[in-house]
C-alpha cells in the first residue's frame, strides 16, 4: 500500500426529510445564492422544501445551469454574487449544478484577471466562499469531494479544477428525490459511479486489500441495485444504496494508498466537449477499449475484478480479464447505454486526432497510473471506440 494523507471535511445529512434541517446548518444572517438547473426541482417538490427550510434567510436565486456547467452562464451568476453581496452558496441539483457552484466558490474570491485561469493554471484551489449542496441526482460524488469540471462552449473545452478549498461544508442526501429522476439520468448515474470506481481500482495490485474490497463492494452494490432502481425509482432501499454508492465512489476514500488512472475521464471529457454526449456515456464509450488497449498492464486487476464482481472463476488470468471487459460492456448495455461513438454522432472520423492534438497542446503527454499513456495512445483508444 502506498503512503497517503486523507481528510474529507464534508458533513453528510442522509435520509428522508433531511432538507428541513438546512436552517440548522447555515449560519444565521447569511445571504444565500441558491443555484439550480433547468427547473425540475420546481416540479418534484424539492424547490418548495428548500424555500420553506430557508424561509428565515435572505435568498437570491439563480437557475438555468446546464447539464455541462457552462462558463458563460456561471459568469452571470458570479456577477450576481458580487452585486448582491452574497456570502453563502447553496447548490440544489446534481453534479453539474454542484460543480458550477464550486467554480463560483473559487471565483468569488479570485483576484486574477480571468476566472477561467482557475481551470487552466492547474493549481490547487485553497480557498472559496462557503457552500453546501442538496443532491437531486446521484452520479458524480461531487457532493462529498473537492473536484469540479467546467465547460466552455466558445472554445469547445471541458476542464477540471479542485483543491482543499472546494469541499462542501455539508451536503443533504435524501433518497426520495430519486423517484422523480428520468430513466436516462438514472442509467447515467449508475454508469458514472461504476466508472469512477474502476478508475481508482483497475490499475495494478499494491497490496491494498481493504481499498480493493471497498471498491468491489461499491461495484457489487451498483450491479445489484441497478435493475431495481430502473424498475422502480421509488424503491427506497434501492434508492438509498444507489445514492450512497455514488457518493462513496468518489469521496476520496477508495483512492487512498492506491494508484489511479483517470485517462478515461480525460478522453471522455473531450467527447462531451466536441459532441455534447452525456458525460457518463462517454465513459462507457472509452472505458472498455482503454482496458483492451492497456490489457497487459491491467490484466491482473481485470481478472480479479472478473472473479469478484462477475463470478468468473475458471480460465487463465488473460481469459478472465477479457471476460471482465465483456461483462462491463454487457452491464452498460443492460442499462440502455450504447458503447460506440458512431452510435452518438456521424462526425466521428477525425475524433482521435483532434483529441490527440488537444492533449499535446496542453502538455498532457503521460496519462494513466504509470504516466505513460501518450496523446498517440489516446488517439488509438478513441479510434477503437468508433
Regions found by a protein language model. Give the residues of each.
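Short alpha-helical scaffolding segments that buttress acidic/His motifs in well-ordered protein cores
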Residues: 194-198, 239-250, 287, 328, ...
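Active-site segments that bind and position negatively charged phosphate/pyrophosphate groups
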Residues: 200, 204-327
Amino acid at each position: 500500500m502506498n503512503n497517503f494523507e486523507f481528510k474529507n471535511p464534508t458533513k453528510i445529512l442522509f435520509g428522508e426529510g433531511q432538507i428541513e434541517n438546512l436552517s440548522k446548518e447555515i449560519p444565521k444572517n447569511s445571504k444565500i445564492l441558491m443555484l439550480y438547473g433547468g427547473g425540475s426541482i420546481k416540479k418534484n417538490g424539492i424547490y418548495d422544501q428548500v424555500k420553506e427550510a430557508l424561509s428565515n434567510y435572505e435568498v437570491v436565486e439563480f437557475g438555468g445551469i446546464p447539464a455541462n456547467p457552462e462558463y458563460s452562464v456561471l459568469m452571470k451568476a458570479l456577477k450576481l454574487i458580487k452585486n448582491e453581496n452574497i456570502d453563502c452558496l447553496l447548490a440544489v441539483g446534481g453534479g453539474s449544478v454542484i460543480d458550477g457552484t464550486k467554480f463560483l466558490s473559487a471565483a468569488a474570491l479570485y483576484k486574477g484577471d480571468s476566472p477561467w485561469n482557475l481551470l487552466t493554471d492547474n493549481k490547487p484551489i485553497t480557498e472559496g466562499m462557503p457552500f453546501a449542496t442538496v443532491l437531486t441526482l446521484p452520479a458524480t460524488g461531487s457532493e462529498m469531494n473537492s473536484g469540479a469540471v467546467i465547460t466552455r462552449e466558445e472554445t469547445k473545452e471541458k476542464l477540471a479544477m479542485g483543491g482543499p478549498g472546494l469541499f462542501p461544508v455539508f451536503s443533504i442526501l435524501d433518497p426520495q428525490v430519486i423517484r422523480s429522476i428520468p430513466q436516462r439520468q438514472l442509467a447515467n448515474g449508475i454508469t458514472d459511479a461504476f466508472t469512477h470506481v474502476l478508475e481508482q481500482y483497475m490499475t495494478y495490485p499494491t497490496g491494498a486489500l481493504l481499498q480493493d474490497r471497498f471498491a468491489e463492494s461499491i461495484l457489487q452494490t451498483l450491479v445489484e441495485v441497478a435493475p431495481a432502481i430502473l424498475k422502480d425509482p421509488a424503491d427506497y432501499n434501492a434508492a438509498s444504496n444507489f445514492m450512497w454508492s455514488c457518493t462513496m465512489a468518489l469521496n476520496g476514500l477508495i483512492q487512498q494508498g492506491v494508484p489511479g488512472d483517470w485517462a478515461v475521464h480525460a478522453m471522455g471529457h473531450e467527447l462531451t466537449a466536441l459532441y455534447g454526449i452525456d458525460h457518463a456515456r462517454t465513459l462507457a464509450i472509452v472505458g472498455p477499449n482503454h482496458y483492451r488497449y492497456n490489457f497487459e498492464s491491467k490484466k491482473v486487476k481485470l481478472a480479479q475484478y472478473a472473479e469478484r464482481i462477475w463470478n468468473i472463476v475458471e480460465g487463465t488470468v488473460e481469459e478472465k480479464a477479457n471476460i471482465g471487459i465483456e461483462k462491463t460492456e454487457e452491464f452498460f448495455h443492460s442499462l440502455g447505454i450504447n458503447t460506440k461513438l458512431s452510435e452518438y454522432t456521424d462526425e466521428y472520423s477525425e475524433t482521435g486526432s483532434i483529441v490527440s492534438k488537444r492533449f499535446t497542446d496542453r502538455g498532457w503527454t503521460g496519462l494513466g497510473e504509470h504516466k505513460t499513456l501518450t496523446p498517440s495512445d489516446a488517439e488509438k483508444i478513441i479510434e477503437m471506440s468508433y
